[in-house]
UniProtKB/Swiss-Prot annotation:
This is Flagellar basal-body rod protein FlgC. It comes from Agrobacterium fabrum (strain C58 / ATCC 33970). PROSITE patterns: FLAGELLA_BB_ROD. GO terms for biological process: bacterial-type flagellum-dependent swarming motility. The gene is flgC. The keyword Mitochondrion does not apply. The lineage of its organism: Bacteria, Pseudomonadati, Pseudomonadota, Alphaproteobacteria, Hyphomicrobiales. Keywords: Bacterial flagellum. It is found in: Bacterial flagellum basal body.
């Protein structure tokens, strides 16, 4: 495989994993206040994504892939909300272990990574087009 095609393939895998990362972040943000339905029930637990590399045997390039989708085993936060159906006898409710500020920072990083991979694909496409134009002009 030529180097430009390899670069596009690698960047394409980067787009895929960053899309997954953005989906997970959006799920976490959307569920940041999702409690259990009954007293003592666990609320939404923050999801995580882990990346890994994988050799593409056809092209010979190392691509990035989603290695594992998991959950954050961190502690839940307890809030006083006696009117909540999930409140215990003391009025305390288990709240998700999602920190929206951390999720927003993760979202920005994923967006930047996605944009960088997209730029690699655009640059590669432009280089291929320039090469084709150069070859046409020399005939």
């Amino acid at each position: 495989m030529d180097p430009l095609s390899a670069a596009s393939k690698i960047a394409g895998s980067g787009l895929e994993v960053q899309s997954t990362r953005l989906r997970i972040v959006s799920e976490n943000i959307a569920n940041a206040r999702s409690t259990g339905d009954t007293p003592g029930a666990d609320p939404y637990r923050r999801k995580t994504v882990t990346f890994g590399s994988e050799l593409d045997h056809v092209s010979g390039v190392e691509r990035v892939k989603v290695k594992k989708l998991g959950v954050d085993r961190g502690d839940f936060v307890h809030e006083y909300d006696p009117g909540n159906p999930a409140a215990d006898t003391n009025g305390m409710v288990k709240m998700p272990n999602v920190n929206v500020l951390i999720e927003m920072a993760d979202m920005r990083e994923a967006n930047r990574s996605y944009d960088a991979n997209l730029q690699v694909i655009r640059q590669t496409r432009d280089l291929v087009a320039s090469t084709i134009d150069l070859l046409k002009a020399s005939q």
